[in-house]
Amino acid sequence: MSNSLAVVRLDPGLPLPSRAHDGDAGVDLYSAEDVVLPPGQRALVRTGVAVAIPFGMVGLVHPRSGLASRVGLSIVNSPGTIDAGYRGELKVALINLDPATPIVVNRGDRIAQLLVQRVELLELVEVSSFDEAGLAATSRGDGGHGSSGGHASL
């Protein structure tokens, strides 16, 4: 498998996705448009690039931690998933989580980060039950959504 990612620059006025520091896992994605996000609102924001994720890998679009913590800018479907077969422009579903202040995103602002990771492409096999399939019960069972205990103050 290659260690390169094919990128098409759809907007020549924007930089290619890039790492802020050597060794960073993600590459920063830039906004291709000016957007004002009122409190609680969301927008699908163009990045001006398309990528060809290699087969057996997935692209994951994550919020930039500084923007999330400082101004409440996040991603609606975090992380966004880019499948290997998708070849269109990357778009980021941004949301303003601040309860009072609009967020202004300017063209050229770094708005998200793209991580590319290997993914196991498992074959789905229908079984009538996990016991019949020889998959032993676990201590967790079907417990979910807080079944392992809450926060000390809740």
UniProtKB/Swiss-Prot annotation:
Record's CDD domains? Answer: trimeric_dUTPase
Assembly: Homotrimer.
- Which terms does the record give in the GO molecular function aspect? dUTP diphosphatase activity; magnesium ion binding
Where does this protein act, in terms of pathway?
Pyrimidine metabolism; dUMP biosynthesis; dUMP from dCTP (dUTP route): step 2/2
According to its UniProt entry, the function of this protein is described as: This enzyme is involved in nucleotide metabolism: it produces dUMP, the immediate precursor of thymidine nucleotides and it decreases the intracellular concentration of dUTP so that uracil cannot be incorporated into DNA.
Gene name for this UniProt entry: dut
* Lineage of producing organism: Bacteria, Bacillati, Actinomycetota, Actinomycetes, Mycobacteriales
Cofactor dependence is on: Mg(2+)
Q: What name does UniProt use for this protein?
A: Deoxyuridine 5'-triphosphate nucleotidohydrolase
